[in-house]
Amino acid sequence: MGDVVPIVGSVRGFRWWRLSGAAELLSPWRGPVRWDPGENEASCLARRGMFGWKTSRAPHPNGCPSSRCECGFYALHGLPQLNDGLDRAIWEIDTASSGGRHGLVLGVAAGYGRVLIGTEGWRARFGKVLALFAGPLVTHHTRELGITAAAYNVPVYRDLDAFVQEWGPDRDELAELTA
């Protein structure tokens, strides 16, 4: 993450959410952090408490995210790739299983405000859910996913190519930001 380059607007990225069972999307790994419909503002969850992650006692001078911390809303520049090796990352889940028994759903988020761009993705102070994807053969959480999408006023795609074409990150913008 090199020099600070101001951009106007937002960046898009792919990310996973967990379906809550109550028409809510939760951050799947540092949770349960609920994403609201519309704008969400990140806070630093740098402290681990007895009952989960807690807000940091000392806010970062420049706000969330900080380059010296792991805070902020995360998203990937590209679709998660499967990797069966020992160095597998937690987000490397088969996209075809989105909305399946594990309760995770793939989507696209917009990030804006303070955004740190990395080689594989970004972290942002503000985030918004834009669209969701359910694997074409998935039937487990279909009703719940539809109710959740309606609550967030976002579309649900069953065709991965159409989902990426319509909502995926702008490749030209990414090339400039990661150069």
Model-derived regions: residue spans:
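Low-complexity, intrinsically disordered short peptide segments enriched in small/polar/basic residues
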Residues: 1-8, 102-105, 112, 151, ...
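Charge-dense polyanion-binding interfaces
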Residues: 92-130, 134
